[in-house]
Amino acid sequence: MTTGADAATERQDKPGGKLFIRPWIFIRGVPAMKFLPPEGPPEVAFAGRSNVGKSSLINGLVGRKGLARTSNTPGRTQELNYFVPEGYSGEAGDLPPMALVDMPGYGFAKAPKAQVDAWTKLVFDYLRGRVTLKRVYLLIDARHGIKKIDEEVMDLLDSAAVSYQIVLTKADKIKSPAVTKLVAETGQKIVKRPAAFPEVIATSSEKGEGLEELRAAIVHAVTAG
């Protein structure tokens, strides 16, 4: 049987391993821009439609079930949730090597319109104005593909010159040949987008597929000049 320590050791030996070998913790939820942690360490953010599987993907990346709260209710994540390697507070003078940011889902939420509008403003302000944001991982449900609202978010990222990469989630829910075709089709859809990273990554949080590739991509994003 593989233990958590065994899995961590195995991750350490892979391209994305060293940043993910240490346990990760939640440090704060950010309901408004004024509550953001000090700028300094590089950040990568996870964006996508509500219920696309952001929290499950983050849990899979760091190998810790339940770190990012998952829910069957779309729109449950209402803040920018910050996660860092254990041993850092995220405060000035005790900054981590990097941070993962789980963003509120867009496109649907079981909440009053005013609240949804506030989340939307927070997300857009963060994407446009966070200097330490190195890359956004835009999550797309493999069963549904890119929707109009995803294209609107890509338009925003392109106009703000924020680097982003498409990550297909729940790839285990469709057949393998369909995944290969979807990766190719998605790559073609973003080829002319100026801020889009050309490589599309297919993942399954449930099966662990594509997670090591995504870890390596994150490490490259935060360490490349």
Curated annotation (Swiss-Prot):
GO terms for molecular function: GTP binding; metal ion binding. Its cofactor is Mg(2+). It comes from the Bacteria. Residues 40-224 form the EngB-type G domain. InterPro entries: G_ENGB_dom, GTP-bd, GTP-bd_ribosome_bio_YsxC, P-loop_NTPase. One of its GO terms (cellular component) is cytosol. Keywords: Cell cycle, Cell division, GTP-binding, Magnesium, Metal-binding, Nucleotide-binding, Septation. The keyword Transport does not apply. Pfam families: MMR_HSR1. One of its GO terms (biological process) is division septum assembly. Gene3D superfamilies: P-loop containing nucleotide triphosphate hydrolases. Mg(2+) binds at S55, T77. SUPFAM superfamilies: P-loop containing nucleoside triphosphate hydrolases (SSF52540). GTP binds at residues 48-55, 75-79, 102-105, 169-172, 203-205. Necessary for normal cell division and for the maintenance of normal septation. NCBIfam families: GTPase_YsxC. Belongs to the TRAFAC class TrmE-Era-EngA-EngB-Septin-like GTPase superfamily. EngB GTPase family. This is Probable GTP-binding protein EngB. It comes from Chelativorans sp. (strain BNC1).
